[in-house]
Amino acid sequence: MSWQQFKHAWLIKFWAPIPAVIAAGILSTYYFGITGTFWAVTGEFTRWGGQLLQLFGVHAEEWGYFKIIHLEGSPLTRIDGMMILGMFGGCFAAALWANNVKLRMPRSRIRIMQAIIGGIIAGFGARLAMGCNLAAFFTGIPQFSLHAWFFAIATAIGSWFGARFTLLPIFRIPVKMQKVSAASPLTQKPDQARRRFRLGMLIFFGMLGWALLTAMNQPKLGLAMLFGVGFGLLIERAQICFTSAFRDMWITGRTHMAKAIIIGMAVSAIGIFSYVQLGVEPKIMWAGPNAVMGGLLFGFGIVLAGGCETGWMYRAVEGQVHYWWVGLGNVIGSTILAYYWDDFAPALATDWDKINLLKTFGPMGGLLVTYLLLFTALMLIIGWEKRFFRRAAPQTAKEIA
């Protein structure tokens, strides 16, 4: 394979979702084994909100929530912070390689309000459940934490309500029709594409250099950034978005991304299991009403906003300004949750047990239960897809006729 063939096939074209999500599952497994924590983003975004408040004299470090997730240090001294910086760098490099960066403004104020309000709801719900589509779902279920299953089911339900809500007439933006005499060909500016590809390579190797230099003195921080670059490349090139996995299932019947996510978790689970058997402590959270309520809010919020925590990150660096607002909403929502945490934490979270399936059913039993639940989820998704298109077929035939 020549360089030009490799460049076009792997650096410019989008990647197939299933192999990319499986790769993300494998990468997240090694990330857990090396750093001792799971792939997650909203906890760090919450710390950003807390530290912004500190700049204005607010003693956020005294809040109970920040005593749990720790507010010490800065993004440059925390594993999650370095990983997220790596993710942004990886996303941006991948977008530049494909010349997929263009400033795109929201078409209406309604979309901006959707982004901010949906982002706030999603951020609040994610931190209420102690995790977003990553820590309380994609990387939470392979940790064998029961709370992640509560969150996943609630998120699916919340996304159904979100899908129905966003189909209301108020969210329909008028489309401006323009008469044309012929289709406009899709074109790119070759010089611009070359410049951006080189800039993407500069950013990519710059991030790698930064990570390796950091790893010389602080191995976990440097490796966290390397993993972040990998995660960023995967989510941007494969356009991995958990919002579309849920929303598309309800609205269009498409389940390709949802099935990819299930398979990715199945691949990750056995790897996490092996690390746990070697003595690494899994990340188990409270299996209380917080997981259910947080999932409902998160599922509704991501569909209203149009993007989840990973989805808004790669779209933001592609120049889609709508997702800048979603990200801002996420930080605001998670910070609001941190402020009110002490008021309802005992009733909704901390008085409830942290249930580890590997301890409840034994190591092999917990692994088997997890795979049975994943298989059940996959069968339900396939069943829903068949039912959706079976019901849609008569209507489609009627419209064609």
Model-derived regions, located:
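Membrane-interfacial helix-loop segments of redox and metal-homeostasis proteins
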Residues: 1-401
